[in-house]
Curated annotation (Swiss-Prot):
MF terms in GO: transmembrane transporter activity
Membrane topology: Multi-pass membrane protein
HAMAP family: MFS_YfcJ (MF_02091)
Family per similarity comment: Belongs to the major facilitator superfamily. YfcJ family.
NCBIfam families in alphabetical order: PRK05122.1, PRK12382.1
Signal peptide: none
Transmembrane segments: 22-42, 46-66, 97-117, 121-141, 151-171, 174-194, 224-244, 252-272, 276-298, 342-362, 369-389
Recorded GO CC terms: plasma membrane
Protein name per the record: Uncharacterized MFS-type transporter YfcJ
One Pfam match: MFS_1
Cellular location(s): Cell inner membrane
Length: 392
């Protein structure tokens, strides 16, 4: 056991973890690039309502949550590397469906259907990618550094959102939706080339509890994560339309502000969950997220909205890893992939449900109301986290 622990903390293991995280960054650009563009494509080019915008964005996360169990079993039983590489391939295929939606001379309903197919494929790929890379990273550096694994992967994900959002709007405005789709096809292939030679980690043996018994161990941190996720979901789905409705520019840079603050917090304070435990870090983070969403709700100018997005990103930054540390503590090694997949599924459910519900809210009460709803959810998340872990 000592030999294994020493091996998992070598510089070579850290470099392998970096390669995995950078590959996640490249692959997750397939999420970041189209995220601010899809609402514009659905609402303005296809002529559909806010609710349909919410469905187009949110359905990806339903696909992700429905395949989390499969992704966890794949990582636990057949190896995390296989799960991660399979996810990259699926993310690339999503771009092919969007390319067909852009190029085929078909009606708006058919284009929308192809867009949905691509979102479903992307959701499937995302579940394999994230579950695989988290389990892979834990196998490389060890469970005592689970916070680091989650922090690095989180930086990669939200760094991709920060870079991808304005780049996606730029590509779309200058070259069209087809060029955006083609770009999303290529990036996962580059990611595969970058980390394909990182060593495998063995699958753990031992008795494997049922999925529902694992969920019983992780639902409390998962619920806190889900309530946190509402804030990002409303920003990712409606920030472009919110800016357009106010006549503001720089909508893509809102996600850059969110993602940049997210990554900066991970760089400066990513060590905190391992050092202080997840609960305290999560509660403070949810307070910061609440402040950012309230600022977005009340923003009189684009610059204030950017500050609100940055505060929200700073608040969201450490919550996944903070509560994820609690998940790793609660489950045996042979089901870590299943547990992490199930834990992340709570966030996927939040993203998926928030899109269409927030769309109906925006139609009835205007775009600012969705950010107020996100702030209320974060406050509920604080209460849930405190009450769930009060005995600890």
């Amino acid at each position: 056991m000592t030999a294994v622990s020493q091996k998992t903390t070598t510089p070579s293991a850290d470099f392998s973890l970096f390669r995995i995280a950078f590959a996640v960054f490249l692959t997750y650009m397939t999420v970041g690039l189209p995220l601010p563009v899809i609402p514009l494509f659905v609402h303005h080019e296809l002529g559909y309502s806010n609710t349909m915008v919410g469905i187009a964005v949110g359905i990806q996360f339903f696909a992700t949550v429905l395949t989390r169990g499969y992704a966890g079993r794949l990582a636990d039983q057949y190896g995390a590397k296989r799960s991660a590489l399979q996810g990259m391939l699926a993310c690339g295929l999503a771009g092919a469906a969007w390319l067909l939606a852009a190029l085929l001379p078909v009606s708006a309903p058919v284009k929308f259907a192809l867009l949905i197919v691509g979102r479903l494929i992307l959701g499937f790929g995302e579940s394999q990618l994230l579950t695989g890379t988290l389990t892979w990273g834990l196998g490389l550096v060890g469970p005592t550094r689970s916070g680091k694994v989650m922090s690095w992967n989180g930086m990669a994900i939200y760094g991709a959102l920060a870079a991808g959002a304005p780049l996606g709007l730029l590509i779309h405005s200058h070259f069209g939706f087809a060029a955006l789709a083609g770009t999303t096809m290529v990036l996962p292939l580059l990611a595969w080339a970058f980390n394909g030679t990182v060593r495998k980690v063995p699958a753990y043996t031992g008795e494997r509890p049922s999925l529902w018994s694992v969920v019983g161990l992780i639902w409390k941190p998962g619920l806190g994560l889900a309530l946190q996720g509402v804030g990002f979901a409303v920003i990712g789905t409606f920030i472009s339309l919110y800016f357009v409705s106010n006549g503001w520019t720089m909508a893509g840079f809102t996600l850059t502000a969110f993602g940049g603050a997210f990554v900066l917090m991970r760089i400066l304070f990513g060590w905190m969950p391992d050092r202080f435990g997840g609960v305290k870090v999560a509660v403070v983070s949810l307070l910061v997220e609440t402040a950012g969403l309230l600022l977005l709700w009340l923003a009189p100018t684009a610059w204030i909205a950017l500050v609100g997005a940055a505060l929200t990103g700073a608040g969201c930054s450490l919550i996944f890893s903070a509560l994820g540390v609690e998940v790793v503590k609660r489950v045996p090694a042979q089901v870590r992939g299943t547990a992490l997949g199930g834990y992340a599924a709570f966030q996927d459910i939040s993203y998926g449900v928030t899109g269409p519900l927030a769309g109906m809210l925006a139609t009835s009460y205007g775009y600012p109301s969705v950010f107020l709803a996100g702030a209320i959810s974060a406050v509920v998340g604080i209460l849930v986290t405190i009450l769930s872990f009060r005995r600890g």
